[in-house]
């Protein structure tokens, strides 16, 4: 599927709530030793970090990130209020490459980047439908107009659709739709979750470059999916 390329832009405000970067590697048979070394050295690196050593994994957390390490995979979560662009997250990880190289042995098996956007809103009046909210936050090229929704659709209080396709050689999965506030069903939340996956084995240096490409795809798809009205709000 061909998604138009968009020039990169850092918005003053966003609806981004989750930035997650997952990658896998061959099982590290010296993981216990790696944990011991990392616990000691990371506290010197970042004194604000909270380190939790579990039997099967290691958690390192600050207000700006949470990293979870296993013997064969790693989950990195970044605070979007601090990491205002994915480039900052990539730079941060690249500066810690000695930790990751000793963990993965310079061999990445799979990489996935996931971003979740939550867009609050509401029905304009009692005559409008919840499903019509989708047409307000998503572009016409991405979702159908309210007039084309079925009677069943117009009575929904939540709807999440999943779609998977290939873009520039990377697998992309979208989860999108809306849900209602349980206490006030006129208050709605739009949801757009975009994930890109690279399942080609590569060295750490290529893994970093691929992550930048994957994030670029997410950026392009976000712009393709979101309405001009929402993009205008993000510029303020």
Role assignments for model-derived ranges:
Residues 4-7, 110-189:
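Aromatic/basic-lined ligand-recognition segments
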Residues 27-35, 85-88, 128-129, 201-208:
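Short, conserved charged micro-motifs
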Residues 1-80:
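N-terminal low-complexity, intrinsically disordered segments
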Residues 70-141:
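Internal, hydrophobic cores of structured domains that mediate oligomerization or house catalytic pockets
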Residues 9, 48-59, 102-125, 145-160, ...:
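Short glycine-rich, low-complexity/disordered patches
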Residues 57-81, 175-201:
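Amphipathic N-proximal alpha-helical interface segments
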Residues 23-27, 82, 117-122, 196-198:
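Beta-strand elements of well-folded, non-transmembrane domains
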Residues 186-236:
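Long, compositionally biased interface segments
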């Amino acid at each position: 599927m061909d998604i138009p390329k968009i020039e990169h832009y850092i918005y003053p405000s966003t609806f981004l709530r989750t930035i997650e970067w997952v990658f896998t590697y061959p099982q590290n048979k010296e993981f216990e030793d790696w944990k011991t070394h990392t616990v000691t050295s990371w506290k010197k690196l970042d004194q604000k970090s909270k380190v939790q050593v579990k039997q099967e994994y290691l958690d390192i957390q600050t207000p700006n990130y949470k990293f979870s390490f296993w013997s064969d995979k790693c989950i990195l979560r970044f605070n979007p209020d601090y990491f205002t662009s994915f480039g900052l997250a990539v730079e941060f990880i690249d500066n810690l490459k000695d930790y990751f190289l000793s963990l993965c042995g310079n061999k990445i098996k799979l990489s996935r980047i996931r971003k979740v956007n939550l867009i609050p809103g509401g029905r304009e009046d009692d005559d409008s439908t919840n499903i019509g909210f989708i047409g307000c936050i998503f572009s016409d090229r991405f979702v159908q107009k309210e007039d084309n929704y079925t009677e069943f659709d117009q009575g929904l209080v939540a709807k999440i659709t999943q779609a998977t396709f290939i873009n520039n050689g990377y697998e992309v999965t979208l989860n999108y739709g809306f849900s209602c506030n349980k206490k006030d069903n006129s208050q709605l939340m739009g949801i757009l979750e975009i994930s890109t996956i690279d399942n080609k084995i590569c060295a750490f240096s290529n893994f970093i470059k691929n992550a930048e490409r994957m994030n670029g795809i997410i950026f392009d798809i976000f712009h393709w999916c979101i309405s001009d009205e929402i993009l205008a709000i993000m510029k303020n």
